[in-house]
Amino acid sequence: MVLIPMGRPEPTTIKNKMTKKKIKINTRAKREIDRYPLVAVYWLDICSDASWQSIESSKKSKLPTCVTKGHLLSQKGGITRIFGDYSLADEESGKIDEIGNTTIIPNSVIVEIKKIS
């Protein structure tokens, strides 16, 4: 019989630049859409593999970095919210009626956020 020690696994450290990375929302913009900057969010995703592989090969596996682009809605409560589409209630004033194609990303998996000009 082989005994496997129980307890906490070895910690895996992933550097996360998100701790102090926030992008401000321009609440004073005349057109509502201009309040929400266009951004690219780089984040780490979960990866699974059902194939047979060696332990060493599995230990060398890396998390994939994904990129989501859209308008930054908010960064509160450990969550970054993005939307890709919107409909205008009034085109002249730029008032937004509804948003769509929304993505909610936990800040703990975000590596970087870049503002798109």
Residues of each region from the PLM?
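Short, positively charged low-complexity motifs
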Residues: 1-10
